[in-house]
Amino acid sequence: MKLPFIFLITLLIFVSSCTSILINESSDEQRIYSFSPTTSPFDPRSLNQELKIGRIGYCFDCARACMRRGKYIRTCSFERKLCRCSISGIK
């Protein structure tokens, strides 16, 4: 009689701990993916500034890569992640 009782208690503890872990994970997912633009902590102007800095940085890296090859920069598109160097070399 003692062995089935201990087994049952152990099983209940195991199931309850797994259930609490699953509930915590599901509530974390809800917190992560909920986004409301009206209560957003991001300032659109600072976000736009970060995008400009990213674009300048990407095109600067593109120009450096072209210079290492001894070529001029031809096109740089941050949106399409496109960097093209000229065909002719630097004279």
Swiss-Prot record:
Function field: Pollen tube attractants guiding pollen tubes to the ovular micropyle.
Record carries keyword Secreted: yes
InterPro entries xref list: DEFL_AtLURE1-like (IPR047497)
Primary site of residence: secreted
Keywords per UniProt: Disulfide bond, Secreted, Signal
Family according to the record: Belongs to the DEFL family.
Signal sequence, start to end: 1-20
Expression by tissue: Expressed in the pistil. Detected in the synergid cells.
Subcellular location: Secreted
Protein name: Protein LURE 1.6
Chain's gene name: LURE1.6
Disulphide bridges: C59-C76, C62-C83, C66-C85
Gene Ontology CC, one term: extracellular region
